[in-house]
Amino acid sequence: MEGQSLLMAGLLYLCAAVIAVPLAARLGIGAVLGYLLAGIAIGPWGLGFISDVQEILHFSELGVVFLMFIIGLELKPSKLWELRRSIFGVGAAQVLLSAAVLGGLLWLTDFSWQAAIIGGIGLAMSSTAMALQLMRDKAMNRNESGQLGFSVLLFQDLAVIPALALVPLLAGSDSGHTDWMKLGMKVLAFAGMLVGGRYLLRPIFRFIAASGVREVFTAAALLLVLGSALFMEALGLSMALGTFIAGILLAESEYRHELEIAIDPFKGLLLGLFFISVGMALNLGVLYTHILEILAGVVMLVTVKTAVLYLLARIYGLRSSERLQFSGVLSQGGEFAFVLFSAASSTSLFSGDQMPLLLVTVTLSMMTTPLLMQGVDKILKHRFNEVDDSQEKPFVEDDKPQVIVVGFGRFGQVVARLLMANEKRITVLERDISAVSLMRSYGYKVYYGDATQLELLRAAGAETAQSLVIACNGPEDAMAIVHLCQQHFPHLQILARARGRVEAHELLQAGVTQFSRETFSSALELGRKTLMSLGMHPHQAFRAQQHFRRLDMRMLRALMPNHGDSQQISRVKEARRELEDIFQAELRHEKRQFDGWDEAD
């Protein structure tokens, strides 16, 4: 029966999401708000299909965990070091200022000073899941406001630890005494995780990838995320912080893109479940009986946080067109409030209906954010269509690749080296793990992964790249990549390697006109030198080479519709006679006209 109830719950979540999210998108209110409304509909205060909300809410936090892992993969340690001032400067200022103002307002009501401190800290936190999702939807991750927003969220995650430790101290319980031995063991365990992750993760994934079984690689990625999350929870730290660190440790590895596409589907589903769970947790009974106090609390919360964030963004020097986005996307309460307020309630810091009032306020504030961001978008369209003042800080430079090279064998290496020598930004994808390990040992930026997977191409930057070079060995894979890019990334210029005429025909039929037959050019070059060794003048040998190249391409195009047809033989004979006639004409016309070609190259 328990298994059946679990299946029924899963079916309800899927049905709610499938119905509510498209409707929300049709109404223009966004997918996040659609998930929240779906949760209200099926929760205990809606149709009552789901009653155990807290258990589901705890499980759905894995969505935030997976999201933080992917963000860690995208953030190299060097980049994190560059953000240290915004993390510990703007992030710390936001938490302290917001907590002071909101806590002071709570103290002016019926809250004790201890409860006001915890309430202010909890309300100062923003929703990591909602903010990061909205930042991605609004493409804020490409500019400075997104980086600053991420810095604030990261500091909030770090602030979880001292905030939870503060609860028993304010409650005056015996548990407020610090167990230094236990604390030291936790610090050592955390340091062990960092060292072990730094030196063991790559060899482990190299061993797994060598098996060539994609499902095992996905299982290993899930094991890493869940294992690091549970390890951090056992230490009393944030699960999301643990997976974020694991992601950073692998950010510069060759497995980054493959890990991202392995985790991304789970992240999306669990994030949706998280938002549904938040909607289910909304206590409509408390809302109905205290509607005026709660609405006033939501307005107070959103207004104070927006004002504090806008002020900090201005001091930081953020572009005027980004301040509203930055302050709006972080204006809500967050999922950490549920944890902190529950801990405070267990020590009797809150009295009466204070805790449910705060939780409903936080939940409603999360529901206002998608609507608030729509309003921000409308304001920006009217006010900031023109270029900002030259004194303002420029957009962060986009480091997306200009070219994606698929395959790093002998052929792909030459192409990639030429591009890098000319300072072009490239990303190289290779599925042979031994080749990846070897090339990275020489300093090449090569990533392990199967480029026939749509999400890998997307993670590698195909949506913003200008060109894609297909230099892989397998013709089936090459054609699969061509069709995938033509369907999902039509802006890409596709340049491909063809092993022979058959592959060249297939590429032409698929609409790829820029290709190179891997042995053709080198064979032509050797043929030219052979002609010169027989006494032909360099100029004449070069012209013969170019004539042959043009005629061969004409033959290739002419024979393409009849590939495998009986007419092919006669067409080849006709082309050979045409080539002989051209050479004879060249000999008669260009005899002794070889100025500047006396030296062979």
From Swiss-Prot:
Record Gene3D superfamilies: 1.20.1530.20, NAD(P)-binding Rossmann-like Domain
Pfam families: Na_H_Exchanger, TrkA_N
Any one GO CC term of the record: plasma membrane
Compartments, as annotated in UniProt: Cell inner membrane
Membrane topology note: Multi-pass membrane protein
Primary location recorded for the protein, binned into one broad class: membrane
Transmembrane segments: 5-25, 29-49, 55-75, 87-107, 115-135, 152-172, 180-202, 207-227, 230-250, 268-288, 291-311, 324-344, 356-376
Domain annotation RCK N-terminal: ranges: 400-519
InterPro entries, per database record: Cation/H_exchanger_TM, K/H_exchanger, K_H_efflux_KefB, Na+/solute_symporter_sf, NAD(P)-bd_dom_sf, RCK_N
Keywords, sorted A to Z: Antiport, Cell inner membrane, Cell membrane, Ion transport, Membrane, Potassium, Potassium transport, Transmembrane, Transmembrane helix, Transport
MF terms in GO: glutathione-regulated potassium exporter activity
Task performed by this protein: Pore-forming subunit of a potassium efflux system that confers protection against electrophiles. Catalyzes K(+)/H(+) antiport.
Subunit structure: Interacts with the regulatory subunit KefG.
Family: Belongs to the monovalent cation:proton antiporter 2 (CPA2) transporter (TC 2.A.37) family. KefB subfamily.
Name of the protein: Glutathione-regulated potassium-efflux system protein KefB
Gene assigned in the entry: kefB
